[in-house]
Amino acid sequence: MQYAKISGTGSYLPANRVSNDDLAQKVDTSDEWITARTGIKFRHIAAENEKTSDLAAEAARRALDAAGLNGNEIDLIIVATATPDMQFPSTATIVQQKLGITNGCPAFDVQAVCAGFMYALTTANAYIKSGMAKNALVIGAETFSRIVDWNDRTTCVLFGDGAGAVVLSASDTPGIIHSKLKADGNYLKLLNVPGQIACGKVSGSPYISMDGPGVFKFAVKMLSKIADDVIEEAGYTAAQIDWIVPHQANRRIIESTAKHLGLSMDKVVLTVQDHGNTSAASIPLALDTGIRSGQIKRGQNLLLEGIGGGFAWGAVLLQY
């Protein structure tokens, strides 16, 4: 049986780091308030000339280097993003060009907001298991700073920019063991950006609209449920999970999932304090951090999970 195994990871955060104290100079908030409710201390903001594709390409270069591959050995590129460079073409094709990949491999975007990397990773896994790809470049990249209302203290404190990337390679030994994706459009009003461009006009707000308490309750419930489902369907138990690598949105949501599974926070890769909610980038950012720090080791079992507007959510159980 052929598996899709992680052969390299990479991540990138823009140089401009904004602290809670910095934000307190602009809106009515404080370091204590933000930290107590979210666990966030800093977020990184892309430079004016940095696009989502720039962040994605830099994370991809680092992942390719870690995998020991050159760009033209990649035969699939998937970018998960809710903040693309353009209406079209896909950010994935722009990244392909920036990486100098000329082999004509398929490249496309997926959009499931904060669950985007789960959707992209699951899609790449299917390509590899079917024999349609041998080396897939899977990227989560966002510039959420451009869809945040910096006068709205309830949302501007939460989000940041960044990118994370994974190279998935065909392997005879286990990599991705099981994954599950879910969505329910009945909850779209809890979290969205309602604005749109049509007929040469912008209609609706271009900024994030969020029902914070509603999002919190839904996320806690669904992340616990899908974690249970993926572990059980794979024939595993929670005790066999070495690391949870969750979407980095809110420390309290992450703590709730760990508690539900009966796992200590010592088994959670936690990076939300350093970069805030980077949407589709947050899981691969945390994964790369865990691997490069030496926390995550080869052969260990990882549970990746995320949830985002839509609502869309997903989880992946894999052996690193």
From Swiss-Prot:
Subunit-structure text: Homodimer.
Family: Belongs to the thiolase-like superfamily. FabH family.
Major subcellular location class: cytoplasm
Entry text on domains: The last Arg residue of the ACP-binding site is essential for the weak association between ACP/AcpP and FabH.
Protein name, UniProt field: Beta-ketoacyl-[acyl-carrier-protein] synthase III
Organism: Neisseria meningitidis serogroup A / serotype 4A (strain DSM 15465 / Z2491)
Signal peptide: none
Molecular functions (GO terms): 3-oxoacyl-[acyl-carrier-protein] synthase activity; beta-ketoacyl-acyl-carrier-protein synthase III activity
Class of this enzyme: transferase
Keywords: Acyltransferase, Cytoplasm, Fatty acid biosynthesis, Fatty acid metabolism, Lipid biosynthesis, Lipid metabolism, Multifunctional enzyme, Transferase
Pathway recorded for this protein: Lipid metabolism; fatty acid biosynthesis
Gene Ontology biological-process entries: fatty acid biosynthetic process
UniProt cross-references to Pfam families, sorted A to Z: ACP_syn_III (PF08545), ACP_syn_III_C (PF08541)
InterPro entries xref list: ACP_syn_III_C, ACP_syn_III_N, FabH, Thiolase-like
E.C. designation(s): 2.3.1.180
Region (ACP-binding): 248-252
GO CC, any one term: cytoplasm
Subcellular location: Cytoplasm
The reaction(s) this protein catalyses: malonyl-[ACP] + acetyl-CoA + H(+) = 3-oxobutanoyl-[ACP] + CO2 + CoA
Functional summary from the UniProt entry: Catalyzes the condensation reaction of fatty acid synthesis by the addition to an acyl acceptor of two carbons from malonyl-ACP. Catalyzes the first condensation reaction which initiates fatty acid synthesis and may therefore play a role in governing the total rate of fatty acid production. Possesses both acetoacetyl-ACP synthase and acetyl transacylase activities. Its substrate specificity determines the biosynthesis of branched-chain and/or straight-chain of fatty acids.
Active site: 114, 247, 277
